[in-house]
Amino acid sequence: FKGLYGAALTEGDDITMALDMALDPEGYRLKAADGHCTIEGGSEVGVLYGVFALLRNLQTAGKAWAQFTADEEKAPSNRLRMLNHWDNMDGSIERGYSGDSFFFKDSEILIDVPRLTAYARMLASVGINGITINNVNVKDAASWLITDRYFGALQEYLKIFTPYGVKLYLSINFAAPMELGGMDSADPCDPAVAKWWAGKAQEGWAKLPGL
């Protein structure tokens, strides 16, 4: 609390966090008065959203902890609240105007744990629960994100983003059955192509739980 708000709780004050499965999985209930605060959530993510709500309300109220009061219960109205990055694996960003990617460089996945953790925390603080890390215009090395070549690094991303309630998504290459699978066609109406995609999806979900 001190690291986030700048002041420690005085003796006798407290913040209690608990699960209440009657709440929406991403919902929370926040109550605070007389130096005591309770945060309940429908899941650990719901509790996390409640913590961010507490910090947000503290900052906007402009009151000392002893005078701070809150009584709110909220849940997201939209199930998917997602950011779509157009990052390329060479480190460039299509239509990006503020620097290079911090996900990719030279066809490799960057694992900057402090920076990624700070980013995941920032996303959760405003209720973002999904992120696509690569450009929707998939080409070159990005086509291979759904293979063993990159599964290890993506597992590290899941370890970072999942605790903050942020689900990881990947943009895929329509021509992957041809480029990766050596098939003559990428026609989704072709049963062989559909079977290839089904197998690739199962492989991805098995090695990247939560993807």
Walk through the language-model features, giving the residues of each.
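Feature activates predominantly on carbohydrate-active enzymes
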Residues: A22-G210
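Short, well-ordered secondary-structure micro-motifs within conserved domains or adaptor modules
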Residues: G6-E26, C37-T38
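Mature N-terminal segment immediately following signal peptide/propeptide cleavage
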Residues: F1-G3
